[in-house]
């Protein structure tokens, strides 16, 4: 794997199918509009009503067969976000989640994966769907560097997404071995308050909602009521900019970068695609979304 290439892992596999249906041909046919040092490593997500789901509650859906066909056409790995941390044995027989895994396991090139939190689910997936690679979810909130190292040493995982508050621990990160660095996948654009003490509880609440429960949890972080604003996220101490990727992380030997946004609108996700992948001279004039058709057009 070329260490000078940034592999982006993008949000909204099901949620933003129409956006990617228009964007991916553009990315292939007009590659000169985009940075030559990056590509798309995967697109992740899950349809609504998946009890194995976690991280975010999915609201948008699209036919799984069409989703997979699109990504296979462009040689991009698809990832199911099955990071529910509250699963018990009886949940493992869920028909919808198993059918999705079976469908995703059919692809051999590129292989598809599953983002996972639960150890119970991890062992189940290894046993029943060994064709799928596994990613350790950021919902584990790995803020301790030694815990991150141990996670990267596990053969179970191809990638590990640490908590965003380890993003700027440069000295510690640089002590990782090459094989450990190959597994680290940084979450670049997290909006969560850097000093949040309830991040794990927040993710657990999402897991419970996906199981049909109504957890008693509300975010009390400063500015939470404002919603997601990319301009504000850029000021977060854990934010990883395009310049950071080029000048710091790639030279250090890190290649994988996750962009969050499953619970956001397609316009915001498009903004991320422009910022992280598109050359500045094209960012304002190259692509825009025409509502309500959501067509990606060249202007």
Predicted regions mapped to residue ranges:
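Alpha-helix-loop-beta-strand connector modules within alpha/beta enzyme cores
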Residues: 63-76, 179-184, 188, 279-285
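Catalytic alpha/beta core domains of metabolic enzymes, predominantly
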Residues: 133-252, 257-269
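Single conserved hydrophobic/aromatic residue that forms the stacking wall/gate
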Residues: 287-299
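Active-site beta->alpha loop and helix N-cap motifs at the rims of alpha/beta catalytic domains
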Residues: 10-31, 38-129, 133-148
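C-terminal helical cap(s) of enzyme catalytic domains, especially alpha/beta-barrels
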Residues: 267-285
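Hydrophobic packing residues within well-ordered alpha-helices of enzyme cores
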Residues: 125, 151, 173-176, 276, ...
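Acidic/glycine-enriched edge-of-secondary-structure segments
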Residues: 6-10, 47-56, 220-237
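Short active-site oxyanion
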Residues: 5, 109-114, 158-159
């Amino acid at each position: 794997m070329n260490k000078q290439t940034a592999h982006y892992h993008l949000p909204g596999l099901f949620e933003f199918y129409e956006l990617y249906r228009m964007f991916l041909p553009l990315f292939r046919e007009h590659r000169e509009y985009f940075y030559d040092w990056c590509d798309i490593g995967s697109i992740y997500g899950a349809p609504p009503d998946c009890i194995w789901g976690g991280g975010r509650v999915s609201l948008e859906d699209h036919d799984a067969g069409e989703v997979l066909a699109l990504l296979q056409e462009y040689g991009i790995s698809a990832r199911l976000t099955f990071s529910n941390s509250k699963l018990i044995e009886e949940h493992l027989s869920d028909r919808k989640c198993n059918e999705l895994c079976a469908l995703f396991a059919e692809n051999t090139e590129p292989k598809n994966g599953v983002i996972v939190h639960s150890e119970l689910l991890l062992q189940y997936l290894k046993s029943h769907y060994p064709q799928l690679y596994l990613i350790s979810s950021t919902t584990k909130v790995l803020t301790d560097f030694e815990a991150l190292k141990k996670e990267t040493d596990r053969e179970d995982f191809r990638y590990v997404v640490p908590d965003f508050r380890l993003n700027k621990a440069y000295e510690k990160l640089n002590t990782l071995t090459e094989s450990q660095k190959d597994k680290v996948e940084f979450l670049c654009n997290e909006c969560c308050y850097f000093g949040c003490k309830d991040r794990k509880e927040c993710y657990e609440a999402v897991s419970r909602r996906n199981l049909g429960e109504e957890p008693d949890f509300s975010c009390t972080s400063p500015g939470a009521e404002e919603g997601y604003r990319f301009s504000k996220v850029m000021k977060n101490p854990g934010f990883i900019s395009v310049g950071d990727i080029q000048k710091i992380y790639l030279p250090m030997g890190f290649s994988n970068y996750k962009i969050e946004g499953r619970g956001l609108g397609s316009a915001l996700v498009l903004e991320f695609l422009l910022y992280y992948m598109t050359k500045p001279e094209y960012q304002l004039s190259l692509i825009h979304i025409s509502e309500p058709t959501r067509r990606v057009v060249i202007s």
